[in-house]
Amino acid sequence: LMWLCFLAPAHADSKKEGIDVQDIVFSHIQDAYTWHITEWNGKEIAISLPILVKSEERGWDMFLSHHLHHGQAHHNYYIATEGEHAGKVVEKNSRGEEVRPVDLSLTKNVCGLFLSCGILLFVVLRTAHWYKRHPNQVPSGFTGLMEMIISYIQDGVIKESIGKEEYRPFSSYLLTVFFFILINNLIGIIPVFPGGANITGNIAVTAVLAGCTFIAVNLFATKEYWKEIFWPKAPIYLKLPLPIMPFVEFFGVFTKPFALMIRLFANIMAGHTIILALTCLIFITVSMGLLVNFGMTIVSVLFCAFMNCLELLVACLQAYIFTLLSANYIGLAKVKD
């Protein structure tokens, strides 16, 4: 229902003009230089975010994104509508070429990351402050919920996967990853500002998270782990003269974080896309008559409600799976003789 409230004003005249479903879906799941809130009386209500770019010819430049609305240009900068830089700020240089400047702009996903980090800090500091003030009391309410979640992740996932003697150096990282992914997933489900930022549906974010796990696994791995990589326990004909098994094992070093990255990205992106597509069915069937539109509205609302419940489950499940697999990979790298 909340998705309908935000999409309906923008496409109330869809019966006359029709709607571009692809444009609607991609505009909601992609990053942007503005944070769209809604539309009122045909006017877009959005927050213009600061754009910070560096031109090869003119150096640094900073301005608000509303200068680039509706294909406008500002200081030879504009947002490309097609090509490899579609949706990004590009510059028309003195030779008339379209080039991509150094872009350090504050986009919607970056603002969403700041928001999620602020929420994470608030949750952690509030819980720690309660324990500091009540060291001998049994927690209840929000603090009790946090203790239950932290205890389950640490004792049931981290300690069991890495080992009781080795888990402590990695506990803080894995707990941070779990809550960071969970909060970002939940923010993406909420269509109302300041929610709606598709943070974990951005492959750059999931790549950084997977990269952190990759570093944690390989930087703190034991000698036995690397021995198993380059000289695994396999028949000699699988290692010499062609190093088949060493190649497979070494290839697996990179496929594990790659799988983490794709799994989180694909699951979150798919959920958002399906919900938006189901919502668009209501506006597509406007021109098919009142009866068809009414029937599809009921079907779409029911399916959207089901998908939102499913996406809420996926949001929690993907945070858990990412943490579990990261802990397992770290545990496998801590193998001893």
Regions found by a protein language model. Give the residues of each.
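Alpha-helical transmembrane segments and their immediate interhelical/interface regions
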Residues: 13, 18, 134-138, 165-167, ...
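Alpha-helical membrane-spanning segments of integral membrane proteins, especially the hydrophobic core
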Residues: 100-113, 143-144, 148, 155-156, ...
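Short, non-helical or kinked segments that cap or interrupt transmembrane helices
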Residues: 138, 199-203, 265
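Hydrophobic alpha-helical transmembrane segments and adjacent short intramembrane/lumenal linkers
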Residues: 171, 175-190, 204, 208, ...
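Hydrophobic transmembrane alpha-helix segments characteristic of membrane transport
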Residues: 122-161, 224-226
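Membrane-interface helix termini and inter-helical loops of multi-pass transporters
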Residues: 192-196
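Sec-dependent signal peptide recognition
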Residues: 1-2
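Perimembrane topogenic segments of multi-pass inner/organellar membrane proteins
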Residues: 5-140
